[in-house]
Amino acid sequence: MKPGCTLFFLLCSALTVTTEAHAQTPDTATTAPYLLAGAPTFDLSISQFREDFNSQNPSLPLNEFRAIDSSPDKANLTRAASKINENLYASTALERGTLKIKSIQMTWLPIQGPEQKAAKAKAQEYMAAVIRTLTPLMTKTQSQKKLQSLLTAGKNKRYYTETEGALRYVVADNGEKGLTFAVEPIKLALSESLEGLNK
C-alpha cells in the first residue's frame, strides 16, 4: 500500500477512537459519537450526498465512494472512501443496510514544496463545500468563514468538536501528518419547558 494511503487510513481511524470534545484532552480515550449504538444518521445516502455535492460544486468533483473492509465495527457500519487527488480524500461511515451517512470526512495530507499553498486551498474548498451540501441555506462565503473558524479553533488539537443546530463539526489536526474535517448529525431533544407546553 502507498504511504499516502496508509496515512489516510490512520487519520480516518483517528476519528474512530478519540478523546472527549471541545479541545479538552482528558487522559481517557472514548468512542467517537457516530460509533455509539443509536447514533443518528443524515436522511441522506452516500450516493444522494455525492449527487448533491457534485451538482452544487461542478468545479469540485467527488468521485464514487468505494467500500473499505478494514473496520472492526463491521456489524454496525460500512466505511467507504473516495480519492480526490494525491493528498485529499473523502471518507464516510454509513449505517449498515441503509447506507445513510453517520459521518462524512475530508482528510488532507500536507505536501511540501511550492504546491502546498494551492493544495491546502483546494482542500479547504472541498471542506467548505461539505458544509454547504449539508446546510443548503449557507452561502459560499458563510461556509468558508465557518470552516476557517473551526480550523482556527481546532488548530494543533488532535480532536476538537463544535455543535451547531443538528450538526457536529469535528477537526482532527495532526500537524504535518494531516488534517481531518468531519460533519456528523446529532440528536436534538426538546427542552423540558417546551415538552411541557405540548401536554
Swiss-Prot record:
It comes from the Bacteria. Keywords: Signal. It holds the Pfam family DUF1454. Residues 1-23 form the signal peptide. InterPro entries: DUF1454. This is Uncharacterized protein YiiQ. It comes from Escherichia coli (strain K12).
